[in-house]
Amino acid sequence: MMSKQLAAQVPAEPVVLGKMGSSYGIRGWLRVFSSTEDAESIFDYLPWFIQKAGQWQQVQLESWKHHNQDLIIKLKGVDDRDAANLLTNCEIVVDSSQLPALEEGDYYWKDLMGCQVVTAEGYDLGKVIDMMETGSNDVLVIKANLKDAFGIKERLVPFLDGQVIKKVDLATRTIEVDWDPGF
């Protein structure tokens, strides 16, 4: 059972850093999928929270290790496969105050999601629905508007600051780009 003190703490500004995968073994270990730039960085941001039945719960990381290509974790109080299975697909959440401050021109992916993307000429390319890592640079995945003049459903626009990305305004949730709407 959780103590009242832990139950009272909830993330003021929740940020999803990953999710728990399937159980591993019989002692309550779980695979973990990290969406941090460096997978192991997920362990730098504690405490973790999960939502179960609409309620926030703080979970305590007891241990973690590499297993083949996976990262596996052991949470305090999760001691068998059944308990671990209950956590499969739970998102791992931290409070945004745990994250490091960003430098000028850097953005968290979560802040770019849902932003409207427009060209310098004012053409509305659509909304950011996802981000991809390509190795050389990140790429915005933009869902085009239903009445897109070019009949495009989805656009991939490289997140190259200055070159393609002209202005990011998180207050108005818009990203101005130098990009040909035909692509």
From Swiss-Prot:
GO terms for biological process: ribosomal small subunit biogenesis; rRNA processing. Residues 104-183 form the PRC barrel domain. One of its GO terms (molecular function) is ribosome binding. One of its GO terms (cellular component) is cytoplasm. Its main location: cytoplasm. InterPro entries: PRC_barrel-like_sf (IPR011033), PRC_RimM (IPR056792), RimM (IPR011961), RimM_N (IPR002676), RimM_N_sf (IPR036976), Transl_B-barrel_sf (IPR009000). Coiled coil: none annotated. Keywords: Chaperone, Cytoplasm, Ribosome biogenesis, rRNA processing. The PRC barrel domain binds ribosomal protein uS19. Belongs to the RimM family. Binds ribosomal protein uS19. NCBIfam families: 16S_RimM. HAMAP family: Ribosome_mat_RimM. An accessory protein needed during the final step in the assembly of 30S ribosomal subunit, possibly for assembly of the head region. Essential for efficient processing of 16S rRNA. May be needed both before and after RbfA during the maturation of 16S rRNA. It has affinity for free ribosomal 30S subunits but not for 70S ribosomes. This is Ribosome maturation factor RimM. It comes from Salmonella choleraesuis (strain SC-B67). The gene is rimM.
